[in-house]
Amino acid sequence: MHNKNLDCTLYLVTDRDILKGRDLKKVLEEAILGGTTLVQLREKNVSSKEFYEIAKDIKVITDKYNIPLIINDRVDIALAVNAEGIHIGQKDLPANIVRKIIGEDKILGVSANTIEDALKAQRDGADYLGVGAIFPTNSKKDAESTSIETLKEIKNAVNIPIVAIGGINENNVQKLKETNIDGIAVISTILGKEDVKKACEELTGFFNE
């Protein structure tokens, strides 16, 4: 672990399908003004060229506000736009290999559902872990679920930041209070709202209460 002073409090994962035609850059800017501390660009059904162009565009916004940009899964895109980091799942390239490719200075996030996965990711050079799905989620139909109990156990087992993901909204975020996690990752709870800035402020408020 390389101390990168990561603020994972409110981690926004993008999904343009939820935006209903709204401009991603504009929505991101509102989210950042509302308290988003970390942005992950996730694009599943676009060409590499399109992903690159979107990432370049988004980087302008994240740079403006000094917010780290994390690219989902695509190490090549992350390097091409000089994003601050990359997030990988258990079925993507192994974390230790990704760490070698991106070097020591970039942020490496890894998804983990079990203590074994979490400890391995930490050994392999992860800077933070995404743990979930904690609650049922529409954005990832095949997401394995992780109990709040397991989330707590993972938090206690590792010494890198833990971000909970999966179905987190203003109605259930307080159930995560006693877990001592470092942040929450959300998609539709922010992107699906008319007032994105307010949605971020409310979530951050609940989480910090």
Swiss-Prot record:
Mg(2+) binds at D73, D92. One of its GO terms (cellular component) is cytoplasm. The keyword Magnesium applies. Its EC number is 2.5.1.3. It catalyses: 2-[(2R,5Z)-2-carboxy-4-methylthiazol-5(2H)-ylidene]ethyl phosphate + 4-amino-2-methyl-5-(diphosphooxymethyl)pyrimidine + 2 H(+) = thiamine phosphate + CO2 + diphosphate; 2-(2-carboxy-4-methylthiazol-5-yl)ethyl phosphate + 4-amino-2-methyl-5-(diphosphooxymethyl)pyrimidine + 2 H(+) = thiamine phosphate + CO2 + diphosphate; 4-methyl-5-(2-phosphooxyethyl)-thiazole + 4-amino-2-methyl-5-(diphosphooxymethyl)pyrimidine + H(+) = thiamine phosphate + diphosphate. The keyword Metal-binding applies. Pathway: Cofactor biosynthesis; thiamine diphosphate biosynthesis; thiamine phosphate from 4-amino-2-methyl-5-diphosphomethylpyrimidine and 4-methyl-5-(2-phosphoethyl)-thiazole: step 1/1. 4-amino-2-methyl-5-(diphosphooxymethyl)pyrimidine binds at Q40, L41, R42, E43, K44, N72, S111, K140. GO terms for molecular function: magnesium ion binding; thiamine-phosphate diphosphorylase activity. One of its GO terms (biological process) is thiamine biosynthetic process. Pfam families: TMP-TENI. Belongs to the thiamine-phosphate synthase family. This is Thiamine-phosphate synthase. It comes from Clostridium tetani (strain Massachusetts / E88).
